[in-house]
């Protein structure tokens, strides 16, 4: 019988290491697919994305971690705005930017690949920017702004440069 006595023993194991919550697999090799885009006329954004999906599909078949598109890959859509001046045409092209971003996010999820979009014009409150997006395969995204705008982009289109260089975390590595 215990006679209503009790003993509480506690032993602190100095060799115990608590499990970490970080389940990321650190990759030692990262595969990147660079798209060489042929500028040709497109009638609609659907035509552009038929070509975009071709490249995303091809690069993902090689088990690439990233696919990178070139700057102003959507420029052929400006043909619809030939009747406008240069500055107005690039601003009209900016109307497609959010839809393009959303379509890239869907492709990143569908093909399990991180997509770095080519840069595109985006109208913000304080000006017209040249931006691109990192669309991760988990469905999240980040935006980056081109910092060093060319003199011609300033003169012809009135673009504004971004104010900071950013780095982004991905499932493979930090990029920026």
Residue map of PLM features:
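Active-site catalytic loop in hydrolytic enzyme cores
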Residues: 14, 106, 122-176
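Cys-nucleophile CN-hydrolase/nitrilase-fold catalytic domain and related Cys-dependent amidase chemistry
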Residues: 45-137, 142
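Beta-strand-turn-beta hairpins that frame and shape the catalytic cleft
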Residues: 21-32, 167-176
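Acidic, histidine-bearing metal-coordination/catalytic regions of metal-dependent phosphoesterases
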Residues: 1-28
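Short polar catalytic/cofactor-binding loops
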Residues: 36-42
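Short, flexible loop segments at the rims of nucleotide/cofactor-binding pockets, characterized by
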Residues: 43-46, 92-96, 152-157, 176
